[in-house]
Amino acid sequence: MRTLVTLACSECKRRNYTTTKNKRTTPEKLSFKKYCRFCHAHTEHKETK
């Protein structure tokens, strides 16, 4: 079953994106380089609760 997760910017800690993931196949936390509109730059976004 896919669950909804939130991605937070590693620089400003704001939660900018949501996505879904299958916790059975990917138990580790997700990490993407995405654009943060508050930092005005591409930063690493990590999975949060």
Curated annotation (Swiss-Prot):
<dbReference type="GO" id="GO:0005840">
    <property type="term" value="C:ribosome"/>
</dbReference>
<protein>
    <recommendedName>
        <fullName>Large ribosomal subunit protein bL33</fullName>
    </recommendedName>
</protein>
<dbReference type="GO" id="GO:0006412">
    <property type="term" value="P:translation"/>
</dbReference>
<dbReference type="InterPro" id="IPR038584">
    <property type="entry name" value="Ribosomal_bL33_sf"/>
</dbReference>
<dbReference type="GO" id="GO:0003735">
    <property type="term" value="F:structural constituent of ribosome"/>
</dbReference>
<dbReference type="InterPro" id="IPR018264">
    <property type="entry name" value="Ribosomal_bL33_CS"/>
</dbReference>
<dbReference type="GO" id="GO:1990904">
    <property type="term" value="C:ribonucleoprotein complex"/>
</dbReference>
<comment type="similarity">
    <text>Belongs to the bacterial ribosomal protein bL33 family.</text>
</comment>
<keyword id="KW-0689">Ribosomal protein</keyword>
<dbReference type="GO" id="GO:0005737">
    <property type="term" value="C:cytoplasm"/>
</dbReference>
<dbReference type="Pfam" id="PF00471">
    <property type="entry name" value="Ribosomal_L33"/>
</dbReference>
<dbReference type="InterPro" id="IPR011332">
    <property type="entry name" value="Ribosomal_zn-bd"/>
</dbReference>
<dbReference type="InterPro" id="IPR001705">
    <property type="entry name" value="Ribosomal_bL33"/>
</dbReference>
<keyword id="KW-0687">Ribonucleoprotein</keyword>
